[in-house]
């Protein structure tokens, strides 16, 4: 995920300030996705404020969706649904760590199973952002101990993502299969508690938190 965002930001930052969609060089690219993420392209991008924003077919998951959206709203993360043209090929959703915004591809939200998995996945990345100390940063941190993630999830992440991203993505992939993980983590993020007071940090996460002055030992 780190490498992905570096590529994405490189594409976005090398694009001139985009006043409107006509200046997008190509659709379904990092260029168009960067335009949407930077909120320079807003046509066919709408904000999701309730579970109904995704469609009435998601009623079976409305409680979980509502809990996640409530926590995201409390921590200042805006959620948007954008036209497929903005998203790089096969991108279903993303959390933009620099802007603390979440984006979902309109093309994929009609399926209740797909939507809830993507919401959990990207919501977990938000929780990882929170685990890094504060949302006012451009970093994310590992939350779970390695042994907590099944090997089949880790193997899938290694096959899908570059080595630098797979530890972060394996957690998010695991969370996508749970109806409590993302919901609970975001509730902690939105509470007065610190993430590392609830989730024991890994050695590397602890080292990062100490270096940044969030914990003393």
Regions found by a protein language model. Give the residues of each.
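Sec-dependent N-terminal signal peptides
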Residues: 4-13
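Sec/Tat signal peptide C-region and signal peptidase I cleavage site
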Residues: 15-19
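Auxiliary, metal-adjacent structural segments of Zn-dependent hydrolase domains
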Residues: 20, 31-98
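Stable alpha-helical elements in mature extracytoplasmic
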Residues: 64, 68, 115, 119-122, ...
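A mature extracytoplasmic/lumenal domain signature
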Residues: 83-85, 106-108, 130-133
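Short pre-active-site segment immediately N-terminal to the catalytic Zn-binding motif
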Residues: 102-119
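Metalloprotease/metallohydrolase-associated module, dominated by Zn2+-dependent proteases
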Residues: 138-217
């Amino acid at each position: 995920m780190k490498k992905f965002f570096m590529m994405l930001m490189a594409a976005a930052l090398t694009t001139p300030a985009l006043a409107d969609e006509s200046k997008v060089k190509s659709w379904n690219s990092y260029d168009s996705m960067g335009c949407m993420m930077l909120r320079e392209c807003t046509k066919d991008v709408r904000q999701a404020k309730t579970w109904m924003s995704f469609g009435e077919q998601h009623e079976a998951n409305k409680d979980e969706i509502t809990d996640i959206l409530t926590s995201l709203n409390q921590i200042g993360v805006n959620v948007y649904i954008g036209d497929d043209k903005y998203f790089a090929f096969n991108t279903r959703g993303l959390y933009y760590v620099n802007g603390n915004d979440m984006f979902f591809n309109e093309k994929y939200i009609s399926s209740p199973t797909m939507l809830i998995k993507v919401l959990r996945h990207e919501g977990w990345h938000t929780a990882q952002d929170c685990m890094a100390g504060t949302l006012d940063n451009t970093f994310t941190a590992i939350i779970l101990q390695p042994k907590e993630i099944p090997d089949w999830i880790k193997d899938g992440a290694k096959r899908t993502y570059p080595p630098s991203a797979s530890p972060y993505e394996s957690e998010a992939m695991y969370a996508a299969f749970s109806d409590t993980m993302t919901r609970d983590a975001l509730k902690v993020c939105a509470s007065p508690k610190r993430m590392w007071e609830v989730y024991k940090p890994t050695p590397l996460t602890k080292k990062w938190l100490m270096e940044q002055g969030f914990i003393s030992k």
